[in-house]
Amino acid sequence: MSAPTVYDVAERSGVSIATVSRVYRNPDSVRAQTRDRVLEAARALGYVPSGNARGLASRTTGVLGLCFPDYADPDAETDAEAEADAEADDSAVMLYSDQIIRGMERAARRHGYALLIAASLAGGPESLVAKVAGRVDGFAVLARTVPTEDLEVISRRLPVVMLAGPREIDHLDHIEVANSDGERELARHLIRDHGLRRLAFVGGLRESPDAEARFRGYQEACREAGLPVADEPDLRAEMMTQAEGERTTDALLDRAAGRERPQAILFANDQMAIGALHALERRGVRVPEDIAVTGFDGIPMSRIVRPSLTTVRQPMRRLGEEAVELLIQRLADPTRDPVSLMLPVSLTHRASCGCP
């Protein structure tokens, strides 16, 4: 079956081709009711706009795509906000994605492909994600980047690999890391090897599947050790950044005023843990003598901070490399059964938990 075209969308939605084009190129210029009708027709048909006005099924581009979430719209950001963001360099997703990008670039070059990268600002076929999908032969998407219904549309026309998080669409190839196993081993290390009993966990939003999996691993370790098992993280961060690490650490210390502090704080990622180190130093709390601190991810900065950060290292570059391999395999054999990979993680012992 041939790929649906702009003509099909126009006919189904009862508008002109020019109107369909405006919906994708300048959506604010089209009345909301008309825009919704066009987008609904596009979803129903499985239409993905091609940036080069070419049918996705007709030829290859020699390009693979990666899309990861972006939590700030650069078009709405003021100059002052942009300058502050650049100075802080505090985006956990950017640091995490950078390692995945490096892995994808290396593997793509081996196969003679270029890599096109996009930060998703919004869902829907009119979004940047769909525009990128029209320019690539295959697409890797980080969890929570594209709404499931929109991803279903895109995946009808080109191979898609989901990275991180649980498998949400059964027919798509999928790669994740052993988040729960890694956090469980980290908590066991603090309990068994350092004799720590009063632990606190700072997680992310419930919508973050990786952060939730890490919390479950923490719960399992506490249960095994006969420690109290919390139903919820001690605190949740709205965004897993250094700033949120500082804020949540201050909140935990304030909450413990007049009673025993936690002996260790486990953070759902490295960026928050690094923010915690800043907060604890500011408040005169010694790490690890007074409170141990741990993270998760193994970003390069975790080696540089003082004290160096104990963390769970996930193979971020390998995640990118495996994504390319799955896309290449899917392009060669579109009908093969979907693949789901679980990549192992490793515990990195450093000074922030008391290891030499």
Predicted regions and their residues:
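Short acidic/polar active-site loop segments enriched in Thr and Asp
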Residues: S16, G62, D137, L196-L199, ...
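Bacterial carbohydrate/catabolite-sensing allosteric modules
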Residues: A44, G103-Y113, S155-M162, R167-P356
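Alpha-helical recognition/docking segments in bacterial nutrient-uptake
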Residues: M1, V63-R188
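Generic structural signal for helix capping and beta-alpha/helix-loop junctions
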Residues: P27, R59, P74, P125, ...
